[in-house]
């Protein structure tokens, strides 16, 4: 099973109406600058104490600025028993460059 997803794959899944949890693990100030619609903000540093906010049976797509923190979050969630988690390769920056140029880059 792959634990990554590209921005184009994510866009296709969202366009199909797939039920996904978009987990933003950036800081609140970053989320205020740019975010994906309908995402849930849980900064990486608060993720361990925020697990109850997430459904272990849901498909979760973690994202951050470039994909590093969300990679850490993906690994952590898998260790905690979340079985359907993917890291968005390239993060919101790749989303802005390849999918939606209206999403601000920072």
Functional labels for PLM-detected ranges:
Residues 1-21, 27-59, 68-106:
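Rhodanese-like catalytic fold shared by cysteine-dependent sulfurtransferases
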């Amino acid at each position: 099973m792959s634990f990554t997803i590209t921005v184009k794959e994510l866009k296709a899944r969202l366009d199909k109406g797939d039920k996904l949890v978009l987990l933003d693990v950036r800081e609140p100030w970053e989320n205020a600058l740019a975010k994906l619609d309908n995402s849930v903000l849980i900064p990486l540093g608060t993720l361990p104490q925020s697990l109850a906010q997430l459904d272990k049976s849901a498909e979760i797509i973690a994202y951050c600025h470039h994909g590093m923190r969300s990679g850490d979050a993906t690994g952590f969630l898998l260790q905690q028993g979340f079985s359907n988690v993917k890291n968005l390769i390239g993060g919101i920056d790749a989303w802005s460059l390849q999918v939606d140029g209206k999403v601000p880059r920072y």
